Amino acid sequence: MRNAQGESWHSSELKFGDLGDFKLENGAVIRDCRIAYHTSGKLNDDKSNVVLWPTWFTGSSKQLIPLAGSDGYVDPSRYFVIFVDALGNGISSSPSNSSVQPRMEFPVFTIRDMVNSQYRLLTENLGINHIHAVMGISMGGMQTFQWIVSYPEFMDKAVAIVGSPRLTAYDMLLWRAEESAIREDKDWNGGVADVAPRLFGFCRTDENQARSVDGAGSDRRPCEFGRGTLFALTFGVGKTNSSSKNSQKMPQTDAQLVYSAPNRM
């Protein structure tokens, strides 16, 4: 494995941590829940050099690996980096890959649930009870803020990069516009269409002109974070009423104001 600077180090193949039936904060359960991850670097004997790096919106753990290095965000020659796929990204348990709760049968989940699943991965599957740092970019930053709130003593440092505890009004407007584009597709059929509308580039409305501006050029299938977004509506994160008054809130964390420190570790 080589990073963006051309440096080479060992990086694990994609691994999965099995959580069994994972209970969510709303009381629902993700059956046979699995969390995917890659690792880079060497774990110290006392496990004191762990850095957890959750994915951004539409991101995968594999896409994070090239961002590490001696001139990157974190140096695997010093730290054992765990790049973790967030719930719903199409690699960890998601509406698109669940055999027991596919599409609209998949339960509603939150940023807090993502963090709780990562906590269980670390403590139950990997035997890690304290980490040096948690860090994340964009929605990974949102997860970082939630880590600070949910497990403040679990890490020594928290680094949120271009992330915020809550979505802005602009973000919410963007998702609502894309949600409308999905719902207006003639094949929508309440989220159980045989072929989902395209989420990147042009959405498949009757006129095929609704343009999605987030994630253009992605080389992998769309991710499905939260409920009430275009991803949720296409792949079915829970059962969603189509009326606007019943639309779900966008993902957000418990955190209100926490300082971020995007310095290199």
Report the location of each language-model feature.
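A short loop-to-beta-strand scaffold at the N-terminal edge of the catalytic core in hydrolase folds
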Residues: 30-42
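Surface-exposed acidic, glycine-flexible loop patches that form ligand/cofactor-binding
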Residues: 42-45, 125
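Alpha/beta-hydrolase
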Residues: 173, 178-265
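A domain-start/cap signature at the N-terminus of enzymes
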Residues: 4-25, 35-37
